């Protein structure tokens, strides 16, 4: 009898441990103090989700009254193709309560997310378009299918885009802003990447429609939660406009590893949006960066005009493809141009080619695989365990 009682107690203890959500506590100097992302288990209904939020808000308010905490509580909720969660500013007692809710899958620290661009080089040549449309290097002509991404919507999730720039005339609209109240591109990074994926002069998919989604400030930084909120908005917008299956999303940004960030981009891809992501500029294995380390998306490393890995580019088995990223000329706010280098510049080349492929009938689910099938195996010194395949648009040149 005593043995049965001990076993029962043991099983109850195991059940209690299993019910507790996992806490991704990786630490690091990019952690935003007292800010968290909470992800619910698959299958949690909308009603249960709202009930959980109400309970968390009540617990937070109670703890705030007891301890005089200055935390703000629940901020934003997201639902990306059935992947539900939220972010907020909580004290430790409230987080303990959240972790013990059996509807919660995991909790992680919110973190700073930054641009994946590097330096400006004035008067550099434009070479990326010629490179992705020819099997041999050195060609300056850009050869592409006349559909040029027509009928496809590209979401530029970045620092915003100068929607009045002549490069985008008649094909762009402002989407949303998750970082501040300034609906402009005060940094220039987002305008540059948009110019590469869909600009009239400097772009790959010259006829694609563009949506500006601002998740990073003029200083080039934001948060994981802000990026997730932006992705959530993109999926909702694409669904409302019947664009799922005819959409692409460029993320020329990143931070340290985040399961929530990876899950968000995975759900966007599964919903019917082709997601291109910058590998990062730390010259390290991209498996340690997010959203670059999400297996479901198309992760782009950066190459030079000489078909060599850019010195700054991340590498590793998670890399899907190389694309031009060193000294890329593109649009700048105010109607001008500028030259930037980074995996931020490689990703929009991939995004633009992806949009062009979708316009030609390739399914969103197959775009990245198709790119890898026709890519040129020419990159020298790609990095340990890294593909040597360079982006090619299949023009036949």
UniProtKB/Swiss-Prot annotation:
SUPFAM superfamilies assigned: Protease propeptides/inhibitors (SSF54897), Subtilisin-like (SSF52743)
Signal peptide residue numbers: 1-19
Predominant subcellular localization, coarse grouping: secreted
Propiece span(s): 20-116
One GO molecular-function entry: serine-type endopeptidase activity
Entries under Gene3D superfamilies matching the protein: Peptidase S8 propeptide/proteinase inhibitor I9, Peptidase S8/S53 domain
This protein's name: Subtilisin-like protease 3
Active-site residue list: 158 (charge relay system), 189 (charge relay system), 344 (charge relay system)
GO cellular component terms attached to this protein's record: extracellular region
Protein family (similarity comment): Belongs to the peptidase S8 family.
BP GO terms, sorted: proteolysis
Source taxonomy: Eukaryota, Fungi, Dikarya, Ascomycota, Pezizomycotina
Keywords: Glycoprotein, Hydrolase, Protease, Secreted, Serine protease, Signal, Virulence, Zymogen
Domain Inhibitor I9: 35-116
EC number in record: 3.4.21.-
């Amino acid at each position: 009898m005593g043995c049965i009682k001990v076993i029962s107690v043991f099983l109850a203890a195991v059940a209690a441990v299993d019910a507790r959500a996992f806490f991704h506590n990786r630490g690091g100097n990019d952690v935003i103090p007292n800010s968290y992302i909470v992800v619910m288990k698959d299958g949690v209904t909308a009603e249960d989700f709202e009930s959980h939020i109400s309970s968390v808000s009540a617990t937070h308010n109670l703890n705030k009254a007891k301890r005089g905490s200055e935390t703000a509580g629940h901020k934003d909720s997201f639902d990306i193709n059935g992947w539900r969660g939220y972010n907020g500013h909580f004290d430790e007692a409230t987080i303990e309560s959240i972790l013990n809710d059996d509807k919660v899958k995991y909790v992680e620290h919110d973190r700073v997310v930054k641009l994946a661009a590097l330096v400006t080089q004035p008067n550099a040549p434009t070479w990326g378009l010629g490179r992705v449309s020819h099997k041999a290097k050195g060609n300056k002509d850009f050869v592409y299918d006349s559909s040029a991404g027509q009928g496809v919507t590209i979401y530029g999730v970045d620092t915003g885009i100068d929607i009045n720039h002549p490069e985008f005339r008649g094909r762009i609209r402002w989407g949303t802003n998750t970082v501040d109240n300034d609906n402009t591109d005060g940094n220039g990074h987002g305008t540059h990447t948009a110019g590469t994926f869909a600009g009239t002069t400097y772009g790959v998919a010259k006829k694609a429609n563009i949506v500006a989604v601002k998740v990073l400030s003029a200083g080039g930084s934001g948060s994981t939660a802000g990026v997730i909120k932006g992705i959530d908005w993109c999926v909702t917008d694409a669904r409302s406009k019947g664009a799922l299956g005819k959409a692409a999303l460029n993320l020329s940004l990143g931070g340290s590893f985040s399961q929530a960030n990876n899950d968000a981009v995975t759900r966007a891809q599964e919903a019917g949006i082709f997601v291109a992501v910058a590998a990062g500029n730390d010259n390290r294995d991209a498996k340690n960066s997010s959203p670059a380390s999400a297996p479901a998306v198309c992760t782009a490393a950066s190459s030079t005009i000489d078909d060599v890995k850019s010195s700054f580019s991340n590498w590793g088995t998670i890399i899907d493809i190389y694309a031009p990223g060193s000294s890329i000329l593109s649009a700048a706010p105010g109607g001008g141009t500028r030259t930037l280098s980074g995996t931020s510049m490689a990703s929009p080349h991939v995004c633009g080619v992806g949009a062009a492929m979708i316009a030609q009938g390739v399914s969103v689910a197959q775009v990245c695989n198709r790119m890898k099938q026709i890519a040129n195996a020419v990159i020298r010194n790609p990095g340990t365990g890294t593909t040597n395949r360079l982006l090619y648009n299949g023009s036949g040149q």
